[in-house]
């Protein structure tokens, strides 16, 4: 049996909070024990059951065994390493390529410090973070597509 606290709408404190858009956590069903003991385990076990069921019903194929005597002409990494592979392929100096790869997470770590004074969560009111995200996404897609192309057109994607 759940214990719920019904809202007292004649309470002036609650009415003031509701007028400001607050107060939704002031009343309602408590998280303990209802959510934590009953709902969360059902969701967790249901997720595990779905994942295990899908892995049993449709296992992923591993593919052909590798032949060390028949190497392909161009060896490409997995798709999620394409932007990093393209950076290493395009930059003439390998040390500079490694430094550029290290600059990506270092630049992402500086974004919260740049916008530390900004209290908004809306992306349109956080111009620095939104700009860094958009430029980074476009650059990663550009480098990822270029890594799958031949080296002579990989930087321009054959467009220019």
UniProtKB/Swiss-Prot annotation:
CDD domains: cytochrome_b_C
Entry's localization field: Plastid, Chloroplast thylakoid membrane
GO terms classed as biological process: mitochondrial electron transport, ubiquinol to cytochrome c; photosynthetic electron transport chain
Transmembrane segments annotated in the record for this chain: 36-56, 95-115, 131-151
Any one of the GO CC terms: chloroplast thylakoid membrane
Protein's membrane topology: Multi-pass membrane protein
Keyword Cell division: no
Primary location: plastid
SUPFAM superfamilies assigned: a domain/subunit of cytochrome bc1 complex (Ubiquinol-cytochrome c reductase)
Single GO molecular function: electron transporter, transferring electrons within the cyclic electron transport pathway of photosynthesis activity
Superkingdom assignment: Eukaryota
Keyword set includes NADP: no
Keywords of the record: Chloroplast, Electron transport, Membrane, Photosynthesis, Plastid, Thylakoid, Transmembrane, Transmembrane helix, Transport
Known role: Component of the cytochrome b6-f complex, which mediates electron transfer between photosystem II (PSII) and photosystem I (PSI), cyclic electron flow around PSI, and state transitions.
Family: Belongs to the cytochrome b family. PetD subfamily.
Subunit structure: The 4 large subunits of the cytochrome b6-f complex are cytochrome b6, subunit IV (17 kDa polypeptide, petD), cytochrome f and the Rieske protein, while the 4 small subunits are petG, petL, petM and petN. The complex functions as a dimer.
Record's protein name: Cytochrome b6-f complex subunit 4
